[in-house]
Amino acid sequence: MASIVAVSAREILDSRGNPTVEVDVVLETGAAGRAAVPSGASTGEREAVELRDGDPARYGGKGVLNAVNNVNTEIAEALEDMDATDQIAVDRALLDLDGTENKGRLGANAMLGVSMAVARAAAFEVGLPLYRYLGGPMARTLPVPMMNILNGGAHATNTVDFQEFMIIPVGADSFADGLRMGTQVFHQLKKVLVSRKLSTGVGDEGGFAPNLASDEEALKVIIEAIEAAGFRPGQDIALALDVAASELFQNGQYHFKKSGAPSRSPKDMAEMYAGWLEQYPIVSIEDGMSENDWDGWKLLTEKIGDRCQLVGDDLFCTNSEILAKGIENDVANAILIKVNQIGTLTETFEAIELARSAGYNSVISHRSGETEDTFIADLAVATQAGQIKTGAPSRSDRVAKYNQLLRIEEQLEGYAEYPGGAIFGI
């Protein structure tokens, strides 16, 4: 048995310079695993609790020493001598120890760090790559990257309301080819912005963060960059949006405070998206309505759900119970998977399996506050989700995931599959 003999944690910094939790797990054989926990900027109300210290004298109250202490004491004691290869039992022990619905006692950041580090240690123990250990022998589907090359919303201090404008290399033959295509468009976008005397500073996720006249203007400059790179919009490169509409929703209306655009009703929003689908090669819209606007979500799904992937992020929070409600009510048709929204790997896999059984797509995702940890790259292949969001091909915290996927594709040699546009029905 691969018994756990040591569990320890420390406070490290994420890509925004905020503290986060890193965990080490050591087994009796000497096998070890390490994992670092990401953190979001725009967070859903129903996400598991990220435990912060609240001491204004340290990191503006964002320290995580209490979460670290929970790992080093209660959690370490509870997991001693447990079998690291029994992930479900380990995660169940964590859930039982916390004893709350939202993981507010121990902290989802403490629990997730342990859950991921245990999986890494177990993979090392049995001599398998992490993606193979988690996914089994059939794990060979590389994800199509959704590359956030223009940032707005809570991820940037500009005049763009929508949080992410992404490009998707649907016409690529492999992950490596898709990454190349997306990167070439990213560099062309910089040239387009320079030609317009716009800022080429980047946001939290590595995408450019210029001040633009409107959210639609972002689509136009990206189309220009795609064509300048020698690609065909819609055939080679498609578009995706993360509206993060919960950040815009107040008193039944969507307010565009950054750009100063007129407020819109849920019906207006749905009609706007439908119009954009006619004008631009958009194949995916994430959080197009607020997490608290289920009627708006229903309207949106009925209006464009047959021809566009509609992803619930804040809506579902990687939570199987909330996802089940969405499935029952025919709301959205895909779920964003963020491991720190739910707090354990077991619950993450449960959400993915529920989505798959209902015909919903899953998109594995980073957070805006990331680390150099590449766990989600392996997770994307292990679950055969077929899609990943991990930012622009810029900033080491984002590129680390892309580079890990390149390594995995190389390891799989001729067995790797890249779904391309097929995952969107194109």
UniProtKB/Swiss-Prot annotation:
SMART domains registered for this protein in UniProt? Enolase_C, Enolase_N
Q: Which cofactor does it need?
A: Mg(2+)
Active-site residues from the entry: 205, 338
Signal sequence region? none
Role summary: Catalyzes the reversible conversion of 2-phosphoglycerate (2-PG) into phosphoenolpyruvate (PEP). It is essential for the degradation of carbohydrates via glycolysis.
**Family to which this protein belongs:** Belongs to the enolase family.
Protein's name in the database: Enolase
Give the species this sequence originates from: Gemmatimonas aurantiaca (strain DSM 14586 / JCM 11422 / NBRC 100505 / T-27)
